[in-house]
């Protein structure tokens, strides 16, 4: 059975709750673990076939820890099947609720050298 990991960067806990929900929905289909972005290291990432990262917005920005994590692990992320989602209140607005139209997603993709296989936005 394939192994996946969900990694979250959260400020107030909403992103963690979303990730816990995703894990619960997927765990009967795939071996899946859940970690805070601070609690997983590069060596552990290599054990997973699929990597999902969820991150919240605080004062208009993703956490610097998110960008450092991606920069540090970019070669692993590029070699795996990956997904990324962002959690922000702007995503509740029509015209800003898709990965292609959400300003925070667009900015994130411009600032990183990572192009995940799947993208999502949640409000």
Locations of regions flagged by a protein language model:
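Residues in the short beta-alpha loop(s) of Rossmann-like NAD(P)-binding domains
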Residues: 10, 38, 88
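FMN-binding flavodoxin-like domain, especially the glycine-rich phosphate-binding loop
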Residues: 2-4, 17, 25, 29-35, ...
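Flexible, glycine-rich phosphate/dinucleotide-binding loops
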Residues: 13, 41, 91-93
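Short amphipathic alpha-helix with an adjacent loop that forms part of the alpha/beta core around
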Residues: 41-47
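Glycine-rich NAD(P) Rossmann-fold beta1-alpha1 loop
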Residues: 10-17
């Amino acid at each position: 059975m394939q192994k996946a990991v969900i990694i979250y960067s959260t400020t107030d806990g909403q992103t963690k709750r979303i990730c816990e929900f995703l894990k619960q929905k997927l765990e009967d289909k795939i071996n899946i673990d859940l970690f805070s972005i601070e609690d997983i290291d590069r060596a552990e990432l290599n054990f997973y076939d699929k990597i999902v990262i969820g991150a919240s917005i605080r004062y208009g920005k993703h956490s610097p820890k998110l960008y450092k994590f991606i920069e540090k692990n970019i070669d692993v992320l590029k070699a795996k099947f990956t997904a990324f989602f962002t959690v922000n209140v702007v995503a509740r607005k029509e015209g800003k609720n898709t990965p292609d139209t959400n300003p925070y997603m667009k900015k994130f993709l411009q600032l990183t050298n990572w192009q995940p296989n799947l993208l999502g936005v949640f409000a």
